[in-house]
Every structure is written in C-alpha cells, then in structure tokens.
Amino acid sequence: MKKVGLRVDVDTFSGTREGVPQLLELFDKYNIQASFFFSVGPDNMGRHLWRLLRPKFLWKMLRSNAASLYGWDILLAGTAWPGRNIARALGPLMKLTAQAGHEVGLHAWDHQGWQAKVGRWSEAQLMQQVQLGVDALANSTGQPVKCSAVAGWRADTRVLEVKQRFGFHYNSDCRGTHPFRPVLSDGRLGTVQIPVTLPTFDEVIGSEVSMNDFNDYILREIENDRGVPVYTIHTEVEGMSQAAMFEQLLLRAQRQGIEFCPLSALLPQDLASLPLGRVERAPFPGREGWLGCQTDVKDDS
C-alpha cells in the first residue's frame, strides 16, 4: 500500500455546512481517516474578487469556471453584507468531524484576510488571528487544537515563529516534498512541517488537464511522487460540485493500493530523524502571488 496524507481544507460557510457532511459520509463509506483544517471566523471569501484585476488570478478563475465550480453564494460571501461567522453557526459540524475520528486542526480565523494581508500584518495582528482561530475551534470541538495549516499556504519564517507559541504538534503551512524541521531566524528548530506535495484541483484544471481526465492525472501524480505524498482537497469542490468525481477517485485509489491517512500518520516516531529545512516565499504554478515553499538546509550537527 502507498500511504498518502489526505488534507481537507474547509474555507467557507457553505463548504462547512454542505461539503463537510458529504465528505464525512464518503469517508465513512470507504473507511478513510483524514485531516480537516477549518476556517472558523467570518466568511469574507467574496472579497477576493478585487484580485480579478490581476491577470494570473483572472486566468485561474476563468480556466476553472469558478462560478460553476464554487457557486455565487461562495464567490460573493462578505461583499455586500458582513461575512457570516462560521464556528458560531456551524461549530457542531466541527465537533462531529472530530467525533468521527478525523484529525481536526485550524486553517484560519479569516481565510480571505490571511491570504490578502498576512504579508503586512504586524506580529501582534498575526498572533491575534491565530489566537482567535484556536479559541473558536477549541470551543467548537471541546478539545485542544493540536495542528494547523495556514490559509493559502501563505507562510514564511515570521509566521512560523508566531505559531511556535501555540504548541502545535505539527503544521502544514507550505508546499514541498517531505516532512521536515524548520530552522527559525535565530537558528532554533520550529514545529515540524508536513508540506503539501501534490497539485490541487484548482491549480491544474483547464490548463494542465481537463475535468474528465483529472482523476487519471492525479493518480499518476500520486504514483510518481517520490517524497512523502500529501494531497489537499477542498470541501467547496470535492465535497460539493465535484463530489461524484471525488468518490470515483477514492474507488480507483483503493484498487491501486493507495491508502489515504491523516497527516500525523506520515511522521516518524523519532521527529529528530527528520531533515532540516526552511519555509521561504516563492511563486508557485497555478497560484497567484507567493506561497510558502520548502527549501532544504544541510544539517551540520
């Protein structure tokens, strides 16, 4: 069996209300455990529309047929009206996810705000965003928050140093090839990172691959991954508009000997055996703007 970490990003109110129950049902049907990362504060995702002025983001929205993929409820959230607080209304679904045996972690307090502003927020603002998210998720699930994955992979060393204070068991804040121990600015080692290694649906659809051929494409990518494969899905896509296609992917993956698992299951017992690395800003195929990306560091110890 080839073990693949399955990360579920929950970005929006609709994705929580509609996509989470659909995925919980699917995972129960196929006996799959995954890692869910919840956005818990205001759903302001519609405020991303100003990014249509940027050619790369406009092309992404056009090639993925975003209106059909996400629906206008998601695309306009938090524009003409205040964004709905996700955990306040839908916290029981977060608790249900944990009770079903899935790993539950923090994605963001304000997903859109993090993606748009993290690069210019002060340290105090970063701390506040993480603290608000941790408090809301812990109140919803009734258990401590032990892992996190920042919105849009917008992380760098400064973000990692802020998150260090929350005592997470691991973070999944960047793109890369294998788990590692990040080196912080003062030379200390930060919380273990488990990078996402595989392309997401919205990064490649309409450019690298057609809708009909996506499952073939991602299964090849999984088989060819020579690192520690981690695949990210979104409740707004694989749990809603593309749920039928995703179920076919799960069926085919089982037949090919692919075992999906929570991200923590990818870690060795001895975390000190993991290589060193850094999280640095870099452009990334299929995405607009910078992402946190893994770079290797030689261990001279």
Curated annotation (Swiss-Prot):
Pfam families the UniProt entry points to: Polysacc_deac_1
Name of the top EC class for this enzyme: hydrolase
InterPro entries: ArnD, Glyco_hydro/deAcase_b/a-brl, NODB_dom, Polysacc_deacetylase_ArnD
UniProt pathway: Glycolipid biosynthesis; 4-amino-4-deoxy-alpha-L-arabinose undecaprenyl phosphate biosynthesis; 4-amino-4-deoxy-alpha-L-arabinose undecaprenyl phosphate from UDP-4-deoxy-4-formamido-beta-L-arabinose and undecaprenyl phosphate: step 2/2; Bacterial outer membrane biogenesis; lipopolysaccharide biosynthesis
Highest taxon above the source species: Bacteria
Catalytic reaction annotation: 4-deoxy-4-formamido-alpha-L-arabinopyranosyl di-trans,octa-cis-undecaprenyl phosphate + H2O = 4-amino-4-deoxy-alpha-L-arabinopyranosyl di-trans,octa-cis-undecaprenyl phosphate + formate
GO biological process, any: lipopolysaccharide biosynthetic process
Record keywords: Antibiotic resistance, Hydrolase, Lipid A biosynthesis, Lipid biosynthesis, Lipid metabolism, Lipopolysaccharide biosynthesis
Domain NodB homology: 2-261
Molecular function GO terms recorded: hydrolase activity, acting on carbon-nitrogen (but not peptide) bonds, in linear amides
GO cellular component: membrane
EC number(s) per entry: 3.5.1.n3
UniProt keyword Hydrolase, yes or no: yes
NCBIfam families documented for this protein: PRK15394.1 (NF011923)
Similarity annotation: Belongs to the polysaccharide deacetylase family. ArnD deformylase subfamily.
Role summary: Catalyzes the deformylation of 4-deoxy-4-formamido-L-arabinose-phosphoundecaprenol to 4-amino-4-deoxy-L-arabinose-phosphoundecaprenol. The modified arabinose is attached to lipid A and is required for resistance to polymyxin and cationic antimicrobial peptides.
Stated name of the protein: Probable 4-deoxy-4-formamido-L-arabinose-phosphoundecaprenol deformylase ArnD
Species in which this protein is naturally found: Serratia proteamaculans (strain 568)
